[in-house]
């Protein structure tokens, strides 16, 4: 898939909001998920939480649990945008377990950032 240049300019908090917009609420019904992410380039910790068909993110800098995903912000974006598969991320030592990320990816809609606008 093409590189989403708009997303590359987003700080992590805004990018996680973007993922929340991509979440298909109907497919996410009844699903619950927690992903702890450590961004090595910005030294930020984040927890993604899926519940009630809503994906939220909050800072988790002091969380002592082992992160599921440890990578740079751009590597994380590549994973969530399909340019890096969960299996590749596991092989590269970035991702501890592919299953939770695969589940989240299955709940996200894909859309082109250059969609046409329909005007009245």
Regions found by a protein language model. Name each.
Residues 1-56, 98-120:
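Acidic, aliphatic-rich amphipathic alpha-helical segments
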């Amino acid at each position: 898939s093409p590189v989403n240049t708009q997303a590359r300019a987003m700080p992590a908090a805004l990018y996680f909001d973007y993922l929340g917009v991509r979440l298909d609420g109907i497919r996410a019904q009844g699903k619950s998920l927690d992903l702890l992410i450590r961004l090595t380039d910005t030294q930020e910790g984040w927890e993604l939480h899926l519940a009630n068909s809503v994906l939220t993110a909050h800072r988790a800098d002091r969380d002592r649990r082992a992160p599921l995903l440890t990578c740079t912000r751009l590597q994380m974006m590549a994973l969530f945008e399909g340019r890096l598969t969960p299996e590749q991320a596991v092989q590269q030592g970035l991702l501890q377990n592919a299953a939770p990320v695969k589940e989240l990816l299955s709940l996200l809609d894909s859309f082109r950032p250059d969609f046409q606008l329909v005007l009245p």
